[in-house]
From Swiss-Prot:
UniProt protein name: tRNA uridine 5-carboxymethylaminomethyl modification enzyme MnmG
Residues annotated to bind NAD(+): 273-287
Residues the record lists as binding FAD: 13-18
Main localization (coarse): cytoplasm
PROSITE patterns listed in its UniProt record: GIDA_1 (PS01280), GIDA_2 (PS01281)
PANTHER family: GLUCOSE INHIBITED DIVISION PROTEIN A, PROTEIN MTO1 HOMOLOG, MITOCHONDRIAL
Amino acid sequence: MHFHERFDVIVVGGGHAGTEAALASARMGSKTLLLTHNIDTLGQMSCNPAIGGIGKGHLVKEIDALGGAMAIATDFAGIQFRTLNSSKGPAVRATRAQADRALYRQKIQQILQSQPNLRIFQQAVDDLVVENNQVVGVVTQMGLAFESPTVVLTTGTFLSGKIHIGMQNYSGGRAGDPPAIALANRLRELPIRVGRLKTGTPPRIDANSIDFSQMTEQKGDTPLPVMSFVGNVDQHPRQISCHITHTNEKTHDIIRGGLDRSPMYSGVIEGIGPRYCPSIEDKIHRFADKTSHQIFIEPEGLSTNEIYPNGISTSLPFDVQLNLVRSIKGMENAEIIRPGYAIEYDYFDPRDLKNSLETKTINGLFFAGQINGTTGYEEAGAQGLLAGMNASLQVQGKETWCPRRDQAYLGVLVDDLSTLGTKEPYRMFTSRAEYRLLLREDNADLRLTEKGRELGLVNDDRWAKFTEKRESIELELQRLRGQWIHPNSPLLGVLNPELNTPISREASFEDLLRRPEMDYQKLMSLEGFGPGLEDPSAAEQVQIQVKYSGYIQRQQDEIDKAIRHENSLLPLDLDYQEVPGLSNEVIAKLNNHKPDTIGQASRISGITPAAISILLVHLKKRGLLRKTA
């Protein structure tokens, strides 16, 4: 049975990757279908109730700069906002919000339902229809066929998902949801490498059974941060505190005593878990010398008594979970509402993807999110936006696009995955970006919004606000460079008391701001130097661009040097055996990874600069040397 309409783009899955993919495609004018097994769970936060953080907040800002929904929903759902690394340099500062699950889901669903060109339909997908290595549609569990030349799969943990609690296990996509068994079996027939990964979640606790007075209160920041470039603090709901407590030796003894019934340590779980978000039993095993581990007690919302104890993800049996929870200070009488569990699921080797997130072997088939081996809402959302955007571009007959490593954390993410692959759930950190001084949270819009507008992702309202902000920054920088103060100026009376060294020669306002003891707000508050910019984000840009100009220029010079051949394309059908001078090891690695560009090839372990030079000479001789847009 065929559905009565044909679509340009079909998105399978309604999590963070799927919603951003569907919205991006629809914003660009493509007739888009979002298929989900349950409309009520669209935008569901399956694990921790938080958005952002180190590296992750940068991705959220980039999604937002390209017109995505995650940051907007967070501003409406965030019940505690903090700026992490606030005492450090701007490159590593990151916004994190504790989010109300229900409010977040509601806002995402509202955005989806009001998006033109987007149809939502409730059916699980069982089959992928492929003809001559070209995807042509999908078939749902009731045999309904939907036709489309592009399909974006955002299946999360649902592919052959298996949930583990102690030695008990059962099939599931997440707690309370069925797995996608038929689709997983169909995908295993494709010429794409497949593996298994694992993730987990902690038990949820009844807040009424917790003694918060025994814990350390953790309040949000004042003034309140805002996640979206078009958001404001008035959108935030009521703000509340989180709390901090710790495990202890008794907790660790309880965990050690239960390891014989742990699916992780008895060989039942084969999938590899996330290195940077390990289970509590993994922490006890790997860091045996530590007598205590921090636990963040995070509320799941304003209208629920559920608490998420961040730091004790576990798949231990329920009786062990209850005992370990009750051994923790403040939770001696705690009641578990939902047990913690681990989930194993299929993922596909991201080295089999182009940097557009289209598979290299099946035209029109795109993967985004945990199916590519990543972990985290933010990583999923960023991939979803890119995949949905590129599916739409492909339908429109236009060239696909992916930011470079020096343009966005999204570029770093995709390049890492498609070039190096991953054997464990991949999460983003600022340390993964070699050009992080240029890839700050605060300038994500300046980096990406113009490109988003060009691609059709950015609406008129966002574009107007962005251009106004960008113009105000440029005009203010011009003013600071063009206004000067002289040693005999009457303004010295208010200025010199604020300086470590008094003015002895003429200096521009920009020179004054560059001094370490001076900041923009202070300078603008002095009579004769203001009034300055009212928009705090624009003012922050001015300060950063002035104070870090030397470092920024140095990094830009490094990029210009590296980029000379970064985008030189490697033809997909290039036979590396025919390239004279390449070693057998290099040939094997290039055939295994199949890099899209010289830049990707250069980052493969074991590929030497000499091998890159040989490739460039070969491409030039054959007239094959061309670059991406």
